[in-house]
């Protein structure tokens, strides 16, 4: 009986945590607006895949946000960290 109670509790906790995770993902997606003209869609600090890109907006109208750093605009951020800035193409 005790084991059944523990099992049911564990399943309930897992279901609750999954629903919280899903709602957080949905909330993050809702906050992203379509990109305006020439707006940065995402930026990548330092090297291509060293850190996850900071996504700013969603490309629309059949355009995409490239991951090719040769298409990116480079700028130095704080402490001379190289930033690759991507725009919709």
UniProtKB/Swiss-Prot annotation:
Expressed by the venom gland. One of its GO terms (molecular function) is toxin activity. Keywords: Disulfide bond, Secreted, Signal, Toxin. It is found in: Secreted. The keyword Disulfide bond applies. Residues 1-17 form the signal peptide. Contains 3 disulfide bonds. GO terms for cellular component: extracellular region. It comes from the Eukaryota. The keyword Ribosomal protein does not apply. Coiled coil: none annotated. Gene3D superfamilies: 2.20.20.160. Belongs to the scoloptoxin-11 family. This is U-scoloptoxin(11)-Sm4a. It comes from Scolopendra morsitans.
């Amino acid at each position: 009986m005790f084991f059944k109670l523990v099992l049911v509790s564990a399943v309930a906790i897992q279901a609750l945590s999954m629903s919280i995770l899903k709602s957080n993902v949905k909330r993050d997606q809702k906050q992203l607006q379509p990109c305006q003209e020439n707006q940065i869609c995402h930026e990548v600090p330092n090297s291509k895949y060293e850190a996850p890109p900071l996504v700013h907006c969603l490309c629309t109208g059949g355009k995409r946000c490239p991951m090719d750093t040769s298409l990116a605009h480079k700028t130095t951020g704080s402490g001379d960290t190289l930033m690759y800035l991507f725009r919709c193409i």
